[in-house]
């Protein structure tokens, strides 16, 4: 009988790093496209975290900082406390006109008492008019804040805390003239061409040069009804 051919020699074992590579789980082809985008998404994510947001300007930006002087009495969110609430339209019910609110903040309870003025806001307010000293004593911030700070914080109280709609027919003009970033009345107060302490009718024009109807602030007087 013919001799049997010699058995083939067994293959040499793979080096450990080759064996490990063969045993490693392979990444599916479909996942490769996703993984290839990870550096791009990572860059965009980090950029979003590090880019500084655009800072707000104008009365509302200043007003939120000035409101720290008011929060202890009226609540951090305007919910009330020692002083009346501002939230949910409350301050708008009391002061349909921003000028009346500014005047009361300037003179406070003592100023109105000395002038003999009892009703500082809307005399026809639903639920009854608010009277001077009816709930705590309002400080006279005309001696503590600048005039443009007073306007700014009142813009914050009306449009942020109380929820006045700056796009509504009722408040669009007031917001544009007093509380927008380019508000001409606020700018006039800031530059000193309109003083909150004057009893004279202020002369302020809009961007088109048309006069803006503004009630003088001046000395304490009874508040005005809506309309």
What are these regions (language model features)?
Residues 27-45:
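Hydrophobic membrane-insertion alpha-helices, especially the h-region
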Residues 59-62, 66, 97, 101, ...:
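Stable alpha-helical elements in mature extracytoplasmic
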Residues 16-28:
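Short, Lys/Arg-rich cytosolic juxtamembrane segment immediately N-terminal
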Residues 43-67, 82-84, 91-93:
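Electrostatic cytochrome c docking/interface patches
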Residues 1-15:
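N-terminal intrinsically disordered, acidic low-complexity segments at the extreme N-terminus
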Residues 63-76, 138, 153-157:
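The canonical Cys-X-X-Cys-His
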Residues 16-18, 115-227:
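Flexible coil segments in periplasmic/lumen-exposed cytochrome c-class electron-transfer proteins
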Residues 75-146:
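Gly/Gly-Pro-rich "capping" loops immediately C-terminal to redox-active cysteine motifs
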């Amino acid at each position: 009988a013919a001799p049997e051919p010699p058995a083939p020699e067994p293959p040499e074992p793979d080096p450990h790093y080759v064996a490990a590579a063969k045993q490693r789980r392979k990444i599916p082809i479909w996942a490769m496209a996703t993984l290839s985008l990870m550096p791009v998404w990572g860059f965009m994510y980090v950029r979003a975290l590090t880019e500084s947001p655009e800072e707000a300007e104008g009365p509302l930006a200043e007003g939120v900082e000035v409101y720290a002087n008011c929060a202890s009495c009226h609540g951090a969110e305007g919910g009330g406390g020692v002083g009346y609430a501002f939230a949910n339209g409350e301050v708008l019910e009391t002061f349909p006109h921003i000028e009346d609110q500014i005047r009361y903040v300037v003179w406070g309870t003592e100023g109105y008492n000395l002038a003999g003025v009892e009703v500082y806001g809307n005399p026809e307010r639903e639920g009854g008019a608010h009277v001077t000293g009816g709930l705590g004593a309002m400080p006279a911030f005309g001696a503590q804040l600048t005039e443009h700070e007073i306007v700014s914080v009142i813009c914050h109280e009306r449009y942020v805390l109380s929820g006045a709609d700056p796009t509504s027919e009722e408040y669009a003009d007031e917001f544009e003239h007093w509380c927008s970033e380019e508000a001409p009345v606020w700018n006039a107060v800031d530059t000193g061409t309109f003083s909150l302490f004057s009893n004279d009718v202020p002369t302020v024009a809009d961007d088109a040069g048309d006069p803006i109807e503004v009630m003088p602030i001046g000395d304490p007087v009874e508040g005005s009804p809506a309309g």
